[in-house]
């Protein structure tokens, strides 16, 4: 069911700072099951396509540059109410506004380098997951 899965990326800043293990531990400790996982690097074209919804925003160029500067960890997660529960787990986009104990409060540096991406809807979770994973890569 769509509402049982969400998509996340551990962004280049968190990968560079060695936070993959801590973030994945927090995700699984919160009841999510990892159904797809890979370390990869987005090309400029990948990032421009993935973030196309933001292409008119003033931060688009910086976002693409940031997301292509190093590897990311892409994952599809499964849990009842996955999208909403994961967005609660990661916290506000700006780590200064994120609740204590959230992933962004623990691992993000700034609003621009905020450690993780989380899908904002069931529909986007499906689209974003399919962008990074073929059907045979999901379990």
Curated annotation (Swiss-Prot):
- Which EC class is this protein assigned? transferase
Among the GO biological process terms of this entry, one is: GTP biosynthetic process
Top-rank taxon of the source lineage equals Bacteria
Output the Gene3D superfamilies linked to this UniProt entry.
Nucleoside diphosphate kinase-like domain
Binding partners and assembly: Homotetramer.
What PANTHER family does the entry give? NUCLEOSIDE DIPHOSPHATE KINASE, NUCLEOSIDE DIPHOSPHATE KINASE DDB_G0292928-RELATED
Q: What's the name of the protein?
A: Nucleoside diphosphate kinase
Q: Which organism is it from?
A: Christiangramia forsetii (strain DSM 17595 / CGMCC 1.15422 / KT0803) (Gramella forsetii)
